[in-house]
């Protein structure tokens, strides 16, 4: 999806989305009032079940309507791909916690994704996110797509790792439109 998004292959993205809509995943979960987000999340909920990763969500109603299918796909699939990859490396209990809510005092929508992470994902020398992907040339495309979506909607993204308790935190804030 990321490659299709970057090359702006709208017809191929549309075909992919239509195939998603026809999959058996569509009846598995309803964690939000956004049908398309449910389709995306159902895949990750199943992946987490298969890998014994606890997956928790708290998604408030009426949010994310400003994201089109392409942006929603780029944002959530890339963040969740990374979260599942990281959580699956844990030797003990692993988890992913996704929360989406509106913060009226800040006039923004907050996406909070916290996942277990066995060690710091940051390169000790450069301070940038590192990868364990076999094809190092593909490193960074997903997060660049996420950053593109965040920037396109005048949002902010923060990433941080807690060395003591071992979770990796991703927070994305989108201002009210």
PLM features: what roles do these ranges have?
Residues 15-22, 33-51:
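Short beta-to-alpha transition helix within the HATPase_c
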Residues 29, 54-75:
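Conserved short strand/loop->alpha-helix "switch" segment adjacent to the catalytic nucleotide/phosphoryl-transfer site
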Residues 84-92:
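A short, flexible helix-to-loop-to-beta junction within the catalytic ATP-binding CA
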Residues 79, 83:
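Hydrophobic residues in the alpha-helical elements that line and stabilize the ATP-binding pocket
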Residues 93-107:
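Short beta-strand/loop element within the Bergerat-fold HATPase_c
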Residues 107-140:
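Glycine-rich/acidic phosphate-handling loop/turn and adjacent ATP-lid/helix
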